[in-house]
């Protein structure tokens, strides 16, 4: 198993992706002194008995209520218990672990004032596979992801439940005991520090971002295969066209499409004498649409990388002056905007793919392919309903792509009068990824079927490798059969990265690299 060293403020996107995939996590030792200094600063504030929000006051609208020193531990426990009011299905274990790692990185910067032993417990839970059961609904993305993070913190104090990969639920105290850990007694500010923050929204947004990156690469492969199946032109991918417009994503996706189609005998067969002047937009404008999606994902990636390496607690502790300053870093507007960007990109990637599927099944548009890609149309329906399925999934994603960040609703007796809705905006991304991956899977099957009708002509070497990998899992459709297993098998190849791997061509990604 790979391992990621969390150096607070310095974790690249690749590190967060590895953690989501199950990498082991350890906190870099360099951050330990800062954690201790911030905890000492909080202890000094308690000793001075000066009023500081969240340390010796109530919370939210109750911030003006002073709390006696004898009740400070109860105050922190109470905020956890009262705020653990989430509902809905639990977070996926992988995303919950990513949320915990993000919280660990935030606490490790020494601006939250939690004790070293509190950080050590969270670190040990990650190392020993203790994952809190966190209901996924209940956050509005300000003041932080309170309800979800309260469920995480509840497990740390032995309350609530934990969950494993199989979905088995275990009482939190028992889950801790099984691996030799003891529930935590929270110190001053610690309950608030663990609850305040955008880690729930950021974890979901990162998971959606990484899924979108995988999707975009698979969609480029599918789009190239559709160009050959429809006997389309590669002229629109000429680098001179894209250099004049200057958009980086457009330039890179055009290059990827050229690389994928290079050497295609299908393309060579109609270079001369083809009376079609221009292909439909779904083939011809792939660099413009996919490049714009790539640029949008990169903007979102930059925002999320910054957020993942920042501190979104409140108040923030500055040990050098002994101050605890109240602000609004918990407001997840940057995450909400990033999630909306990802949703728009996901929607458009799927929408363009569905249009290519529609082209391939329509004999009026597909340049000689049989209706619905079946040898005997009429007796067989072929790809008629898979295209309908793709249309349904794309339309569902269009509804989900409505920006979440434009919504707001006042909470906490109007003290928290503007919220980001980042949690909802980020949570919707994984279902959108799944929908879009299913659409790409349908396109791959349709494009491979279309190329089968062009035999003995062959596509390029990269695309022939993709066809071979696809045909190893899904045979050619010569007559109607129960279709669902074909779709499931193709979707599994897309989801698992086998399609991109088979192509063996460098494809652009969100961090500027290729894979």
UniProtKB/Swiss-Prot annotation:
Its EC number is 4.3.1.3. The modification 2,3-didehydroalanine (Ser) is found at residue 143. InterPro entries: Aromatic_Lyase, Fumarase/histidase_N, HutH, L-Aspartase-like, Phe/His_NH3-lyase_AS. There is a cross-link at residues 142-144 (5-imidazolinone (Ala-Gly)). It catalyses: L-histidine = trans-urocanate + NH4(+). Contains an active site 4-methylidene-imidazol-5-one (MIO), which is formed autocatalytically by cyclization and dehydration of residues Ala-Ser-Gly. Keywords: Cytoplasm, Histidine metabolism, Lyase. Belongs to the PAL/histidase family. This is Histidine ammonia-lyase. It comes from Methylobacterium nodulans (strain LMG 21967 / CNCM I-2342 / ORS 2060).
């Amino acid at each position: 198993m790979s391992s990621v060293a969390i150096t607070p403020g310095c974790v690249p996107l690749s590190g967060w992706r590895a953690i989501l995939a199950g990498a082991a996590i350890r906190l870099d030792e360099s951050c330990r002194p800062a954690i201790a200094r911030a905890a000492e600063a909080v202890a000094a504030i308690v000793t001075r008995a000066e009023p500081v929000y969240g340390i010796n006051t109530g919370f939210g609208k109750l911030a003006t209520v002073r709390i006696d020193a004898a009740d400070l531990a109860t105050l922190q426990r109470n905020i956890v218990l009262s705020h653990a009011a989430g509902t809905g299905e639990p977070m996926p274990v992988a995303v919950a672990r990513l949320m915990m790692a993000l919280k660990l990185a935030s606490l490790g910067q020494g601006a939250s004032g939690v004790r070293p032993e509190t950080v050590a417990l969270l670190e040990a839970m990650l190392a020993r596979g203790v994952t809190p059961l966190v209901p996924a609904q209940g956050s509005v993305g300000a003041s932080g992801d309170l309800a979800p993070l309260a469920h995480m913190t509840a497990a740390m104090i032995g309350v609530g439940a934990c969950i494993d990969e199989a979905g088995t639920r275990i009482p939190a105290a028992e889950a801790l005991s099984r691996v030799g850990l003891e529930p935590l007694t929270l110190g001053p500010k610690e309950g608030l520090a663990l609850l305040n923050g955008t880690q729930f929204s950021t974890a979901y947004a990162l998971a959606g971002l990484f899924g979108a990156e995988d999707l975009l690469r698979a969609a480029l492969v599918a789009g190239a295969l559709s160009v050959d199946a429809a006997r389309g032109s590669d002229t629109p991918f000429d680098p001179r066209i894209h250099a004049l417009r200057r958009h980086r994503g457009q330039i890179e996706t055009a290059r990827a499409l050229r690389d994928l189609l290079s050497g295609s005998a299908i393309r060579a067969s109609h270079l001369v004498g083809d009376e079609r002047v221009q292909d439909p937009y779904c083939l011809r404008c792939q660099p413009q649409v996919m490049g714009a999606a790539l640029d949008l994902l990169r903007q979102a990636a930059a925002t999320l990388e910054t957020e993942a390496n920042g501190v979104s607690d409140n108040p923030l502790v500055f040990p050098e002056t002994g101050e605890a300053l109240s602000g609004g870093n918990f407001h997840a507007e940057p995450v909400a905007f990033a999630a909306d960007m990802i949703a728009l990109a996901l929607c458009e990637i799927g929408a363009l793919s569905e249009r290519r599927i529609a082209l391939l099944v329509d004999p009026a548009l597909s340049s000689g392919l049989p209706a619905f890609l079946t040898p005997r149309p009429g007796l067989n329906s072929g790809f008629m309903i898979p295209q309908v399925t793709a249309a349904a999934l794309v339309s569902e994603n269009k509804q989900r792509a409505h920006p979440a960040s434009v919504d707001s609703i006042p909470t906490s007796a109007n003290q928290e009068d503007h919220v980001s809705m980042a949690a909802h905006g980020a949570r919707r991304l994984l279902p959108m990824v799944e929908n879009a991956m299913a659409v790409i899977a349908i396109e791959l099957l349709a494009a491979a079927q279309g190329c089968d009708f062009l035999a003995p002509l062959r596509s390029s070497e990269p695309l022939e490798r993709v066809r071979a990998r696809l045909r190893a899992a899904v045979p050619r459709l010569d007559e109607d059969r129960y279709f669902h297993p074909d779709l499931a098998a193709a979707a599994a190849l897309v989801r698992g990265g086998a399609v991109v791997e088979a192509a063996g061509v460098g494809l652009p990604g969100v961090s500027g690299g290729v894979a």
